[in-house]
């Protein structure tokens, strides 16, 4: 990390609780060190259009955003991508598989905030290195012809890697945030807004409408300059049902209630994890199958599903004493350090079931 900027000359009333400012490379410089190739950029654009077409009802496939709750080990993430890529190709007629590659984690109170914030998992907060690692992982996944999906949490970090992203999400804790609605209005890919943590759907409905409109707000240019950002609005926004403290909302009745609110041609995504499964990876398998039943039964409203999946099922605690950098034996390879995930073998079976459900829906529509 760069040396902190001194605060000695700051006005006596300013920055009383700021310890230091650590400079970041500009987005332009970081991207130039690891750019997309023209072929990769073209693939990202096509993936974005495919996803937009599915949510618009112009493509009858199902978007499946699947991958780890969070990326903490780049090597394991790429191993997972190598398992997923052939499946994405084989099931492409029925599913648009997008790898979930999340680097930023919102915390209810405190905790590890993701690979960008603390890439070494040891509270050294080497954010410049985290940005470099994140960009490399994304490009490595894109190079496997896999679209990537990310949650956008920090309002300035997308400038460093959003060019690689085919689909984005605004999480349950930030859907009501004006900052994130404005951010979504300028993003170049389709964006999903989750319902609130309490299960409130209206905040996501409002967020979609807000993001569809132009905005002016404070932001950072590609050169790193503080700027007024003017956006055109993002017409490719949709709702993600993730359940809440009020209970799950992945069932057919909940989907129908949202359709009534949005209009008969509404299309949405369902998160099979989080409050829809109680963060239980075993229950998540059942939720995926319940959603597949809706699809095979003819529901056109379900255009996407999100699944938390990794090489090894379950989750482990992020114990600093286990880290090799601290002399420990190391974490379990390929297992989540945040929410519990479905293992890769079970995931493969579920993807085949979802593809079959799409084929049944397609046949019934003829």
From Swiss-Prot:
Q: Which GO terms describe its molecular function?
A: 3-deoxy-7-phosphoheptulonate synthase activity
> What GO cellular component term, any one, is given?
cytoplasm
Instruction: Establish whether keyword Transferase is in the entry.
Output: yes
Cite the EC number.
Answer: 2.5.1.54
Listed under catalytic activity are: D-erythrose 4-phosphate + phosphoenolpyruvate + H2O = 7-phospho-2-dehydro-3-deoxy-D-arabino-heptonate + phosphate
Tell me if Amino-acid biosynthesis is a UniProt keyword of this record. yes
Q: Which UniProt keywords apply?
A: Amino-acid biosynthesis, Aromatic amino acid biosynthesis, Transferase
**Which superkingdom heads the taxonomic lineage of this protein's source?**
Bacteria
Which InterPro entries does this chain map to?
Aldolase_TIM, DAHP1/KDSA, DAHP_synth_1
Q: Which Pfam families match?
A: DAHP_synth_1
* Pathway as given in its UniProt record: Metabolic intermediate biosynthesis; chorismate biosynthesis; chorismate from D-erythrose 4-phosphate and phosphoenolpyruvate: step 1/7
Q: Name one GO biological process term.
A: amino acid biosynthetic process
Known function: Stereospecific condensation of phosphoenolpyruvate (PEP) and D-erythrose-4-phosphate (E4P) giving rise to 3-deoxy-D-arabino-heptulosonate-7-phosphate (DAHP).
Q: Describe the family membership recorded for this protein in Swiss-Prot or TrEMBL.
A: Belongs to the class-I DAHP synthase family.
Q: What is this protein called?
A: Phospho-2-dehydro-3-deoxyheptonate aldolase
Gene transcribed to yield this protein: aroG
């Amino acid at each position: 990390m760069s040396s902190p900027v001194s605060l000695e000359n700051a006005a006596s009333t300013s920055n009383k609780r700021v310890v230091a400012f650590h400079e970041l490379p500009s987005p332009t410089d970081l991207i130039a060190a690891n750019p997309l190739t023209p072929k990769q950029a073209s693939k990202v654009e096509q993936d974005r259009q495919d996803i937009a077409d599915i949510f618009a009802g112009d493509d009858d496939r199902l978007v499946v955003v699947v991958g780890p709750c969070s990326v903490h080990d780049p090597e394991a993430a790429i191993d997972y991508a190598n398992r997923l890529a052939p499946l994405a190709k084989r099931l492409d007629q029925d599913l648009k598989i997008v790898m979930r590659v999340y680097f930023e984690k919102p915390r209810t109170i405190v905790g590890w905030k993701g690979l960008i914030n603390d890439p070494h998992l040891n509270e050294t907060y080497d954010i410049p290195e985290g940005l470099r690692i994140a960009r490399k992982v994304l490009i490595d996944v894109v190079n496997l012809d896999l679209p990537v999906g990310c949650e956008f949490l920090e309002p300035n970090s997308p400038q460093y890697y959003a060019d690689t992203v085919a689909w984005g999400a605004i999480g349950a804790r930030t859907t009501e945030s004006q900052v994130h609605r404005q951010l979504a209005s300028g993003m170049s890919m389709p964006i999903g807004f989750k319902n609130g943590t309490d299960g409130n759907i209206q905040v996501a409905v409002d967020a979609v409408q807000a993001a569809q409109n132009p905005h002016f707000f404070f932001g950072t240019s590609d050169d790193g300059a503080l700027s007024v950002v003017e956006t055109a609005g993002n017409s490719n926004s949709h709702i993600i049902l993730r359940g809440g403290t009020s209970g799950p909302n992945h069932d057919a009745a909940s989907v129908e209630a949202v359709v009534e609110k949005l209009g008969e041609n509404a299309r949405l995504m369902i998160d099979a994890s989080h409050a829809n499964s109680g963060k239980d990876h075993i229950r998540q398998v059942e939720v995926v199958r319940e959603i597949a039943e809706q699809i095979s039964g003819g529901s056109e409203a379900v255009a996407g599903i999100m699944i938390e999946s990794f090489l090894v099922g379950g989750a482990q605690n992020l114990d600093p004493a286990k880290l090799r950098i601290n002399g420990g034996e190391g974490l379990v390879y390929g297992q989540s350090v945040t929410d519990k995930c479905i293992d890769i073998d079970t995931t493969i079976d579920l993807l085949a079931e979802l593809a079959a459900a799409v084929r049944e829906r397609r046949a019934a529509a003829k």
